[in-house]
Regions:
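Flexible helix-coil transition and linker loops at the boundaries of alpha-helical arrays
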Residues: 197-206, 246-266, 333-348
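Short aromatic/hydrophobic "clamp" motif used to bind/position activated sugar donors
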Residues: 90
Length: 366
């Protein structure tokens, strides 16, 4: 089935002249209207207007000063919702993304305008997950005015039901937009989240952002340039562990759960704690958390990679090989879309080569 419903592209862009046309070229064949907020000072706005003029697709740009992500995303979403575009759906995209649609993609879910919204597959370097960036244009959506990790909702407190679109319709994220120019982006995210959630008294009522404080410090350990070097890294790892452990206890009452069950949030929390201990060279603790994590999501490989990396650093190649043999098992394929929370594509035999790389090290040295 081919596309029948009409789609409005919605975006918010800064100084993106280096990548904006790539995004537009990827999606123009699938859209019927566009509403794009511009808050930069380079040629991005004129590139957008010239591009769509050439393609004869109606829409408009508008200027709005930059405040912070939640406010600006909500402003551009409200502008799209209130525009006279006649579209059924609003598709959100960032400037450093591309839309990929397989030739055999089944458009029937999108043609059914009874759905409230869709979860779209998002792929970045080494990661795949779902995000709710495709909304029914007839409903009253809004972005919460979050400073980081903005969340989208229906007005009136109604819970929305998202349909998982097949991976044949996906966003590909290249992380080369203007927001990625700051090497300490994730540290800034963590501090901003602490300011609003901890100092603002919201932490215990908002488990989503509670988790992302820990994740932002985790990412700050993996990507950042700090004046105190490893001293800073260990401190941010400590903070990540602190938030993940308290998230598990406060949100999941983790210490009182008698039997594990499949839960990706618990799995990723334990895995990230293990990674922070590994980065801090506390291998015994790291191994313990990686083993514990696997109980909560046996199909996922991230914790197995963590174990292999620990044994590699310890020089225990025989034990490392026991783990890497699992990573190259042809049965341990990527579990997406059945499991979909920040799945690392590098760690599965059918989607990446890191497991084979670790296995070659183990075989060579054992």
């Amino acid at each position: 089935m081919k596309k029948e419903a009409k789609i409005c592209l919605n975006a918010m862009v800064g100084n993106e002249e280096h990548c904006i046309e790539r995004m537009l070229k990827s999606c123009y064949e699938y859209i019927d209207y566009w509403v794009i907020q511009c808050n930069g000072n380079d040629k991005t706005q004129s590139i957008i207007e010239d591009f769509f003029k050439d393609k004869d697709i109606p829409g408009f740009t508008y200027n709005h000063e930059w405040d912070y992500p939640g406010i600006n995303r909500d402003h551009t979403l409200q502008t799209a919702l209130n525009a006279e575009h006649g579209c059924d759906w609003i598709l959100r995209m960032d400037a450093d993304e591309q839309l990929e649609v397989d030739d055999d993609f089944d458009w029937s879910p999108i043609n059914d305008t009874n759905f409230e919204c869709f979860n779209i597959t998002a792929r970045s370097a080494g990661s795949i997950y779902y995000r709710t960036w495709f909304w029914n244009a007839k409903l009253a959506w809004y972005f919460e005015h979050d400073r980081r990790h903005e969340t989208v909702h229906l007005r009136g407190g109604a819970q929305h039901n998202a349909f998982n679109l097949a991976p044949g319709f996906r966003h590909v994220i290249t992380n080369d937009g203007v927001t990625w120019e700051d090497p300490n982006k994730f540290l800034v995210d963590a501090v901003e989240l602490e300011k609003t959630q901890v100092a603002g008294g919201k932490l215990l009522e908002d488990p989503y952002h509670f988790w992302y404080i820990g994740k932002s410090y985790y990412d700050a350990v993996n990507l950042g340039d700090y004046p105190l070097g490893m001293t800073h890294t260990k401190e941010y790892a400590r903070r990540s562990i602190f938030y993940f452990e308290n998230y598990l206890d406060r949100v999941h009452n983790y210490k009182n759960i008698e039997e594990p069950f499949v839960n990706e949030m618990i799995y990723m929390s334990l895995y990230c704690i293990g990674e922070m201990y590994r980065k801090s060279k506390e291998f015994e603790k790291a191994i313990s958390f990686f083993v514990e994590a696997e109980d909560w999501c046996p199909r996922r490989n991230e914790s197995i990679v963590g174990l292999a990396e620990c044994y590699n650093e310890l020089g225990d190649y025989e034990t490392m090989k026991m783990q890497t043999e699992r990573l190259v098992d042809p049965q341990r394929t990527i579990p997406f879309p059945e499991l979909y929370f920040l799945v690392n594509t590098n760690f599965y035999i059918d989607s990446g080569g890191y497991g084979k790389y670790l296995h070659s090290i183990a075989c060579k040295n054992s």
